Amino acid sequence: MSTELDFEKPIRDLKGKIEELRTFTEEKEIDLSDEIEKLEKRLHALEENIYGNLKPWQRVQIARHGERPTTLDYIEQLFSDFLEMHGDRLYGDDEAIVAGIAKYKGQPVTVIGHQRGKDTKENIRRNFGMPHPEGYRKALRLMKQAEKFHRPVICFIDTKGAYPGKAAEERGQSEAIARNLLEMAGLKVPIVCIVIGEGGSGGALALGVGDRIHMLENSTYSVISPEGAAALLWKDASQAQRAAETMKITAPDLKELQIIDDIIPEVRGGAHRNVAEQAEAIDQVLEKSLKQLSSLTTEELLNKRYEKYKKIGEFSHVNDAISVN
């Protein structure tokens, strides 16, 4: 059973009441089907109300859920013949990034993604999904290989950010991220990026320069965490909920700002409720994106990518005079 979040307590309590009635019915052999049916209708309405009106901070909580599907979960669901590749050929291998070749509906593709752990031991091994420079350089090595063999690149984004430790800085963290941005902008094959959890700062962006950028409904994409923003703006990390509402980090906000292309609907309650069903929703958008991009010539692909990023952040001057009393 999935771990419930704080705001889901009313749902949890009502489910508990329904389960109690079912147990009572079985033990006492009393027909309470009408009462159970009424409670189930109330439960459905409650879920619709809560999950249909999620606040930014609640989406952050879902994006961070410990049982949320990872890159490897989606690779297992969406691709066949996945062969993971290791190492950047410069320093070492970084398990915070998974990269390899696979087949998607019979088509050879390159798949790259952040990978966090499912428990403490795996999180330590994968550095909690926060890559070192060798992780980004491994990703770039696979991207250049994909370009050589004309394979589309599919990136799954799910990280709190690039690892900010001393060793990472010594090995050129900022250069590795910047190099990926530069190379992805000119990569001569289709790139589809999907934010499946947290999209944290440059650590996410280093896998996020694509021809299509999609987000799961309850994922986030931001330049800094809400806690970090709150600490900077108000000197109080406990103001994270307020920061999340101000920062415009959710999929609906970023769709409105034209940062992303599509919002992928999530299973009610979050992707962790049903991985297979969530993968089907991703599959529909991914197939459509690859079909559209594969029909373009290399020149058309690069020109459209250039125009896509050129218009992000455009603004208009307001010429109306402002009077100050």
From Swiss-Prot:
Q: Which GO terms describe its molecular function?
A: acetyl-CoA carboxylase activity; ATP binding; carboxyl- or carbamoyltransferase activity
This protein's major location comes to cytoplasm
Fetch the Pfam families from UniProt.
Answer: ACCA
Q: Does the keyword S-adenosyl-L-methionine apply?
A: no
Instruction: Give TM segment ranges.
Output: none
Say what the protein does. Component of the acetyl coenzyme A carboxylase (ACC) complex. First, biotin carboxylase catalyzes the carboxylation of biotin on its carrier protein (BCCP) and then the CO(2) group is transferred by the carboxyltransferase to acetyl-CoA to form malonyl-CoA.
Q: One GO CC term of this entry? A: acetyl-CoA carboxylase complex
Upper lineage: Bacteria, Bacillati, Bacillota, Bacilli, Bacillales
Q: What subcellular locations does the record give?
A: Cytoplasm
Q: What is this protein called?
A: Acetyl-coenzyme A carboxylase carboxyl transferase subunit alpha
